[in-house]
Amino acid sequence: MHNLPINSYREHEFAAVAAHSVYLNHAGVGPAPTRVVQAVSDAVALTSRDPIGAFISLVMPAMASARARLARLMGVPAEHLAITKNTGHGLSLVADALKLDAGDNIVSVDCEYPSVVYPWYAQADRGIETRLVTPKLDGTFTADDLDAVMDSRTRVVTLSWVQFGTGFRCDLASIAAAAHARNAIFIADVIQGLGALPLNAQELGIDIAVTGVHKWLLAPPGTGGLYVAPHILDRLRLVNMGAGAVVDVMKFDPLDFTVKPTVQRYEEGSPNVLGLVGLEAALSLLEEVGIDAISRQVLALSGYAAEKLDAKGYEVRSPRADYQRAGLVTFRHRSLPNASVLKTLEEANVVGAVRGGNLRFSPHFYNTTEEIDRAVDALPG
């Protein structure tokens, strides 16, 4: 980790986006830092000159380094982390692979992002029921709320670490414990916190963790991560098999279907090389800054935004308690529709979003309080 001031990273890595707009939508898509642009550009140039050589020289180093960095950020062993295409890909793999019987059920919440629940809806033809808990009026929920709908046939509890529409950060450890008390697997989508907040998935008792990389991780879309704890692996069927599933990926004659002994058996074939190169570069930046420093800045900025929105007369919908909040600040005007307010922001060159019936700001570590001031000042009174 380097001790450069935050504004140095802003100047050297985020000058393009900072000059273009007040960008407060990292919960949607993060901007590519300068080093990511350069790394991907160099890789493209190499593939145009020497395709096979580029593939050989780029794939293994980029995958190994990106995997190791992503594993450190997630708090899991690298050997138990597979590289996927995105969050939905990882969750779909797990839903299709998990050994279930007709009458089993899955528990989640009804404010979830579609990728978290749709893979389980698709298991209805196997006789699998999806049970959704409605959060409290403030958008929060607890392990007890989830446990109230669990029973002896509950096999999975699955939800997001941070809710995309409210910004609520759930208590992963207590929910994992509640799931395990029912002999259920706990699956967490960590995309809305990873890169903004510290995480130790293994220590928290998460059995399966999934993520994409195009939000707070500031990497190109099209790559993701899937962690499966080793004691869970034998509960997953072999699905999505390809050449990358086996121990000796270069053994063609005769074929040898000896699958890898970890979740990496689900890495079907040729990976997203340019995405991995970009991911490795993006993660190198986050490691330089340090996740603790990033988290302090993100939480300080989101807290500052909530205070400014209060002062402007807006209804802040995201949680205020430190243990429940993250980098997302959700809010509403007292009378104007969200679409109208968002249009006003766009006209002022402020990039936010509307999700879950709320307006949303999601600043990252390189943003400034001055940018928050500009964004709130641009809001209609």
Predicted regions: what is each one?
Residues 1-381:
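Pyridoxal 5′-phosphate
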